[in-house]
Amino acid sequence: MLIIDGKKVSLDLKNELKASVDNFRSITGKVPGLTVIIVGQDPASQVYVRNKAKTCKEIGMISTVIEMADDTTEKHLIETIHKLNNDPTVHGILVQQPLPKQIDEFAVTLAIDPSKDVDGFHPENLGRLVMGHLDKCFVSCTPYGILELLGRYNIETRGKHCVVVGRSNIVGKPMANLMLQKLDATNCTVTICHSATKNIPFYTLQADILIAAIGKAGFITADMVKPGAVVIDVGINRIEDPSTKSGYRLVGDVDFEAVSTVASAMTPVPGGVGPMTIAMLLKNTLQSFQRINNL
């Protein structure tokens, strides 16, 4: 079975992005800038933001983190976003989720200029994705990362049956729409399964490409997978494990050990889809920089 190594691909991609950033710096004297806003003290969010900032700096981009208190008002957050929208040195704006309950996440998403929405969450970017205008939008980073993996591993997708398990706005919905497009690593027949789907194995057993993004540890078992299928595991779930120093370990939505005896190729957890998400965020930021500067 082939292991689809997101850690390696993300490293290759980051090296490519660094070379591009260095080239644009020598030509224009400018570099891409990403600003991340974090509201509150959520530990997981703080880790994610630190990782994004660290990777950003490693490839030569300007990274700015704006920290706001838990009691920040929606009005203040949106005013800050509007200032960033008008700042020519900022090419990507990301508001780390989740947000405190007094803030409407959708209102915040709408406040971000679509041309700087490098997370790909703005309805304008999602609409352009659905219509196939991928050269004029930003694709949500996790689906975009999966597309990159499929392409770099030369996974045959044209005319294949892709089943996406999960319908979140961040992964499931954009992933399904992406796999419908007429691209080298897409052009599939697509089925979406979700919490109200009856007899999910009936659909997953038909999948040539199975993408699991349901948020349940080990949900996809070997008897749900068609022999020879390509399995992409988006899930990141923390489960107790007394044998580890931390007392827990990370697993995906797929029972990796069992499914690896059936699948032809799989992404591991950790080290599969996860590392690609930040890499694609930076790729989107570079694309924004190029568009804004007509490069």
Swiss-Prot record:
* EC assignment: 1.5.1.5, 3.5.4.9
Any one cellular-component term (Gene Ontology): cytosol
Catalytic reaction equation(s): (6R)-5,10-methylene-5,6,7,8-tetrahydrofolate + NADP(+) = (6R)-5,10-methenyltetrahydrofolate + NADPH; (6R)-5,10-methenyltetrahydrofolate + H2O = (6R)-10-formyltetrahydrofolate + H(+)
In terms of InterPro entries, this protein maps to: Aminoacid_DH-like_N_sf, NAD(P)-bd_dom_sf, THF_DH/CycHdrlase, THF_DH/CycHdrlase_cat_dom, THF_DH/CycHdrlase_CS, THF_DH/CycHdrlase_NAD-bd_dom
Q: Which keywords label this protein?
A: Amino-acid biosynthesis, Histidine biosynthesis, Hydrolase, Methionine biosynthesis, Multifunctional enzyme, NADP, One-carbon metabolism, Oxidoreductase, Purine biosynthesis
Coiled-coil region list: none
Its pathway is: One-carbon metabolism; tetrahydrofolate interconversion
A Pfam family (short name) is THF_DHG_CYH_C
Q: Could you cite one Gene Ontology molecular function of this protein?
A: methylenetetrahydrofolate dehydrogenase (NADP+) activity
**Span of the secretion signal?**
none
Superkingdom of the organism of origin: Bacteria
Any single biological process term in GO: tetrahydrofolate interconversion
Question: Gene3D superfamilies attached here?
Answer: Leucine Dehydrogenase, chain A, domain 1, NAD(P)-binding Rossmann-like Domain
Q: Where does NADP(+) bind?
A: 166-168, 195, 236
Query: What does this protein's UniProt record list under function?
Result: Catalyzes the oxidation of 5,10-methylenetetrahydrofolate to 5,10-methenyltetrahydrofolate and then the hydrolysis of 5,10-methenyltetrahydrofolate to 10-formyltetrahydrofolate.
Quaternary structure and interacting proteins, as annotated: Homodimer.
Q: What family does this chain come from, according to its entry?
A: Belongs to the tetrahydrofolate dehydrogenase/cyclohydrolase family.
Can you say what this protein is called?
A: Bifunctional protein FolD
Question: What are the top taxonomic ranks of the organism?
Answer: Bacteria, Pseudomonadati, Chlorobiota, Chlorobiia, Chlorobiales
